[in-house]
């Protein structure tokens, strides 16, 4: 097969154009074949054209090969000939050959890495990659394909583009109308979407509410928890879907018969999606861990999600940064990029959450600079919503939602809006509000002013207490 490939690289222009972008010297065994390919590649790189047999012989004469290497290449070049072959068959067989060689090389590399890792630390080859590189090596080998698609042609593909505008194939709608309005029909597959909130404001509540809504719309949801137990997450979904409060479940106010009846009623609905909840230790899983989980779920449960929820990004680990770093910008940005890449690969909508900084915990407004983890997160995310809850909003069972970033539309339209919240049921609900965003902003503004006044009063009270304590400590 090697002689056939090298021959057609020289004599078949159509074949060369098709396979050359995927060819590499590492796919040939050391010896005449690899050396001949290197001569071809050197000529192509220098002259941007396919070499002739004469050009190869001249390059061979000018090479620094040993006598044995020279003899082997000379013999192989003399065997290269223009023999007719079916183009489709030849391309397909070449693809198989390259895939097999890539897998062989990857397996050999993995064995080297594993063997090196098993040695005592002082005897290890420090230049050898860590075992953490093994998944990337294998994934790269498995991804090799002679795919002829080279991108979207703005002029030639305008019809398909228009159809995609009309059918919104990449959009996954929300149950809540206001979210559909600001995203123009829903979040898109292959995107990273983030909820921002302070401690105990409702990051997990928002994610659970979204999960329950997506379920009712018929989508499969994978909920990955990095802190809460699987049963705790499922209990929140129970409270939402079964219309019972968390207290009712915890205090035994609902019997097993009632619980079973409600669950079976949902089972009868043919439009209901599936939910899988999986917990990992805090800081103990990364995007590669989630890839493995997705593969297992597909094989063992025939489960392929449309929505992936990671609760939450800041307590995941990076699959690229293995050494602890105090540079949170680099680490969080890496995790965000890896999760977004996972969403693109799996064609899913990925939701996660982020913590706001301490300075914004009691604030009635939040902006991009208030993200606690890293400024690298908004640089990567496609859509970010801040969840704001003042004392007044909490008393009214409402939360103020603010668009921080949006690639779905102009974030300044409906930049802020109110959402009803039922904490006992872990649910966001629509509330009646005016059809224009300005009215919502005015309502939000009055609540913000009141909240700032309350916070000022609390700060003054705290300062007075500290002054009194300081006076008592004087000698």
Curated annotation (Swiss-Prot):
UniProt KW Hydrolase keyword: yes
Ranges for region Interaction with the helicase assembly factor: 456-475
Annotated Pfam families: DnaB_C
MF terms (GO), sorted A to Z: ATP binding; DNA binding; DNA helicase activity; hydrolase activity; single-stranded DNA helicase activity
Keyword Aminoacyl-tRNA synthetase: no
Record key words, sorted: ATP-binding, DNA replication, DNA-binding, Helicase, Hydrolase, Nucleotide-binding, Primosome, Viral DNA replication
Residues binding ATP: 197-204
Annotated GO biological process: bidirectional double-stranded viral DNA replication; DNA replication, synthesis of primer
Full protein name: DnaB-like replicative helicase
Organism per entry: Enterobacteria phage T4
Subunit details: Homohexamer. The homohexamer is a trimer of asymmetric dimers. Interacts with the DNA primase; this interaction forms the active primosome complex, which is composed of 6 helicase and 1 primase subunits and expresses full helicase and primase activities. Interacts (via C-terminus) with the helicase assembly factor; this interaction brings about the rapid assembly of the helicase onto ssDNA.
E.C. number: 3.6.4.-
InterPro entries on file: DNA_helicase_DnaB-like_C, Helic_T4, P-loop_NTPase
Residues of the SF4 helicase domain: 165-444
Function as written in the Swiss-Prot or TrEMBL entry: ATP-dependent DNA helicase essential for viral DNA replication and recombination. The helicase moves 5' -> 3' on the lagging strand template, unwinding the DNA duplex ahead of the leading strand polymerase at the replication fork and generating ssDNA for both leading and lagging strand synthesis. Interaction with the primase allows the primase to initiate lagging strand synthesis and fully activates the helicase. Loaded by the helicase assembly factor on replication forks that begin at discrete replication origin sequences, as well as on forks that are created during recombination.
Protein family according to the UniProt entry: Belongs to the helicase family. DnaB subfamily.
């Amino acid at each position: 097969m090697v002689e056939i490939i090298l021959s057609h690289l020289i004599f078949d222009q159509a074949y060369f154009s098709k396979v050359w972008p995927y060819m590499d010297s590492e796919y040939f065994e050391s010896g005449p074949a690899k050396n001949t390919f290197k001569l071809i590649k050197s000529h192509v790189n220098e002259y941007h054209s396919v070499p002739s047999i004469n050009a190869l012989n001249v390059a061979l004469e000018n090479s620094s090969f040993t006598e044995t290497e020279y003899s082997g290449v000379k013999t192989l070049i003399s065997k290269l000939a223009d023999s007719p072959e079916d183009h489709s068959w030849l391309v397909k067989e070449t693809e198989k050959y390259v895939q097999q060689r890539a897998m062989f090389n990857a397996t050999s590399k993995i064995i080297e890495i594993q063997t090196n890792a098993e040695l005592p630390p002082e005897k290890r080859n420090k230049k050898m990659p860590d075992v953490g590189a093994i998944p990337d090596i294998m994934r790269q080998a498995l991804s090799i394909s002679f795919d002829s698609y080279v991108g979207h042609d703005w002029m030639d593909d305008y019809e398909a583009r228009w159809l995609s505008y009309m059918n919104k194939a990449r959009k996954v709608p929300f149950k809540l109308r206001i979210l559909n309005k600001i995203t123009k029909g829903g979040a898109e597959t292959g995107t990273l979407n983030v909820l921002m909130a302070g401690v105990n404001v409702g990051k997990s509540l928002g994610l659970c509410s979204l999960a329950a809504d997506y379920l009712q719309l018929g989508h499969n949801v994978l909920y990955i928890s990095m802190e809460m137990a699987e049963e705790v997450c499922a209990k929140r979904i129970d409270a939402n879907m079964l219309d019972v409060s968390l207290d009712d479940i915890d205090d035994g106010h609902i019997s097993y018969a009632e619980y079973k009846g409600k669950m079976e009623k949902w089972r009868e609905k043919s439009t209901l999606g599936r939910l899988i909840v999986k917990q990992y230790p805090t800081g103990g899983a990364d995007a590669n861990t989630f890839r493995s989980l997705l593969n297992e779920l597909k094989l063992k449960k025939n489960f392929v999600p449309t929505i992936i929820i990671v609760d939450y990004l800041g307590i995941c680990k990076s699959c690229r940064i293995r050494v602890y770093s105090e540079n949170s910008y680099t680490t969080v940005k890496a995790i965000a990029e890896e999760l977004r890449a996972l969403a693109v690969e799996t064609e899913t909508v990925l939701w996660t959450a982020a913590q706001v900084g301490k300075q914004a915990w009691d604030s009635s407004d939040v902006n991009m600079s208030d993200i606690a983890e890293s400024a690298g997160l908004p640089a990567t995310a496609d859509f970010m919503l801040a969840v704001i809850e003042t004392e007044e909003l909490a008393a009214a069972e409402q939360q103020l939602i603010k668009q921080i970033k949006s690639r779905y539309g102009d974030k300044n339209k409906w930049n802020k809006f109110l959402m009803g919240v039922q904490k006992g049921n872990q649910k966001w609900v629509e509330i009646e509000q005016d059809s224009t965003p300005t009215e919502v902003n005015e309502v939000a503004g009055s609540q913000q002013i009141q909240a700032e006044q309350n916070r000022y009063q609390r700060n003054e009270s705290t300062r007075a207490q500290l002054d009194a304590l300081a006076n008592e400590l004087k000698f």
